[in-house]
Design a protein with these regions (language model features):
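Catalytic palm active-site di-aspartate
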Residues: 1-8, 34, 60-64, 68, ...
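Conserved pre-catalytic core of RNA-dependent polymerases
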Residues: 1-78, 244, 489
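Conserved, non-catalytic sequence blocks in retroelement Pol enzymes and Pol-derived host proteins
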Residues: 5-11, 23, 60-72, 93-95, ...
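Short, conserved micro-motifs composed of acidic
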Residues: 49-51, 121, 136-168
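Active-site palm subdomain of RNA-directed nucleic acid polymerases
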Residues: 74-105
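Inter-domain linker/hinge segments that demarcate the starts of reverse transcriptase
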Residues: 117-132, 191-196
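Basic, alpha-helical interaction scaffolds
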Residues: 159-232, 252, 283-290
Length: 489
């Protein structure tokens, strides 16, 4: 359910604002400044060239004022705290997380389990409006029903005055029951706009670099935001690329695609490869779900990843792969082998991200210190699955399975079957890895928990790399042919 608040910024009551600041513990001096800003404000109405007499304002946060959105968000948070604590409003439960709402400024979306919860939500909003001044505009709000529960009012087309829709637009992206309709709204409807923009500029006598700049700044920007929520259909990408190339070459391409996507030093023009560009942006989402914060929008991806790699939910704490039995293990360190798509029960968006990460993390670390911290679990080279007993005994990283670490000689009371499994894991370590370890004088004690990625023979912390670096790496992997230097006119 997406609720629209009537004249959101203009409705907030001043007294409610002051009490909100006091509730959140702002100091007396700060509260006085806020009162100074809002108290005694006057305004007038411009009508047909004439100004009315000035009158005193008792509510609203001025639009355009830098502090207004922050104050509005604080006022709305009071309502959200009440809704989250209300047991009569039941949200969607994902493992231990119950998600009731998400919000961005005045755009609030609610995820409700049943009809009673929806009724209680609207009732709470009505009560809140008497205090804060924020009223729900039911005619502009929308409701998407995914339940089999009867009597929602589908026949009348409304639920308690809120229109029932088949597709819901949230922050510029459509969600709904029909994937075909959503794909059209999110992607295919943009084709005509792209064609119109390029046809206007086609009349100009532009260079290749100028045309490429227009493609990147004006044409691609129309749909890139949507691709960060779900991957576009493959035929949509083909249609967009056809429009781009028709504009760039005014007909049949004169130079191979792998050449023009290269940088200037390699004879290209930095033409954007859409698939690689989208992958480079989206793979950075892994920086969030494998980080130290646990947000509601990470709940589903974490659940799907556990199911994909058959991780027992009781053993894993959020975020995924973090602090397993007091050992730091991370998905990106494991040189994972991503199972086939048919085993993935979640949204294809996250599976595609994992496949991109698999490509990026193929290359071995350059430094031995980083190499020793690679986990032995879910390792596509060692072909291992997670073993609770062995992990609890302290065997989790490459450094743990070699004689230099006296721990393996003691085996920490492991059963014979587990000892044999541990030795078989050690035997699977490639000779080139073993040589690095034998010839290294590095300490076998220190473990670097950060996710290390090797780009152009240099080790980087994954959380610090940019989309541009990832894009260049993907292009380098894709473009294996030697680029010819072309003369740009």
């Amino acid at each position: 359910m997406a609720l629209d608040y009537t004249k959101a910024f203009d409705s907030v009551n001043f007294q409610f604002i002051y009490k909100t600041f006091k509730h959140f513990g702002f100091g007396d001096n700060f509260q006085k400044w806020i009162k100074t800003i809002f108290n005694g404000g006057k305004s007038c109405v411009a009508n047909n060239g004439y100004l009315s007499e000035k009158f005193e304002i008792h509510r609203s946060t001025r639009q355009g004022d830098p502090i207004s959105p922050l104050i509005f968000i604080m006022g709305l948070e009071i309502l959200f705290i009440t809704l989250r604590a209300d047991k009569n409003i039941r949200g969607v439960k994902i493992e231990k997380n119950e998600i009731k709402l998400t919000a961005y400024a005045d755009d609030a979306s609610y995820f409700l389990r049943d009809k009673i919860s929806a009724e209680n939500l609207l009732q709470k909003n009505e009560l809140s409006s008497k205090i804060s001044g924020l009223e729900v505009n039911r005619s502009k709000s929308e409701c998407l029903i995914l339940s089999f529960e009867l009597d929602w009012g589908e026949n009348s087309g409304t639920f308690l005055g809120i229109p029932i829709t088949e597709n819901l637009k949230v922050l510029g992206h459509f969600y709904g029951k029909s994937q075909i309709v959503c794909n059209y709204q999110n992607f295919y409807s943009k084709l005509e706009k792209i064609k119109k923009i390029l046809s206007i500029w086609k009349q100009r006598n532009l260079t290749l670099i100028g045309k490429n700049l227009l493609i990147n700044s004006l044409a691609s920007s129309l749909f890139i935001f949507n691709t960060q929520i779900e991957y576009p259909p493959s035929d949509f990408i083909k249609l967009v690329e056809k429009l781009h190339k028709d504009f760039l070459w005014a007909g049949v391409p004169k130079i191979a695609h792998n050449t023009v996507i290269a940088n200037f030093k390699k004879g290209g023009i930095n033409y954007r490869d859409l698939n690689c560009f989208i992958d480079s942006i989206n793979v950075k989402f892994l920086q969030q779900i494998t980080g130290s914060h646990n947000y509601n929008h990470h709940a589903l991806p974490n659940l799907w990843l556990k199911q994909l790699f058959k991780i027992p939910t009781s053993a894993a704490r959020e975020p995924y792969f973090y602090n397993f039995f007091e050992n730091i293990l991370n998905l990106l360190d494991c040189k994972i082998k991503v199972p086939r798509l048919r085993y993935f029960k979640g949204h294809p968006f996250y599976y595609k991200i994992l496949k991109t990460a698999e490509v990026l993390f193929q290359k071995d670390c350059a430094k031995i210190e980083n190499f020793l911290s690679i986990p032995i679990w879910f390792n596509r080279i060692l072909k291992t699955k997670f073993d609770t007993e062995i992990s609890k005994a302290g065997f989790n990283f490459i450094k743990d399975v070699f004689p230099e670490n006296q721990q393996i000689a003691q085996f920490n009371g492991l059963r014979n079957v587990k000892i044999r499994k541990l030795k078989s894991i050690r035997d699977k370590v490639p000779p080139i890895w073993q040589n690095k370890i034998v010839n290294s004088r590095s300490s076998f004690v220190t473990v670097i928990p950060d996710q290390i990625i090797n780009l152009q023979d240099k080790d980087y912390n994954f959380k610090d790399i940019t989309s541009k670096q990832i894009y260049q790496q993907l292009i380098e992997k894709k473009n294996t042919t030697t680029c010819r230097v072309i003369k740009l006119v």
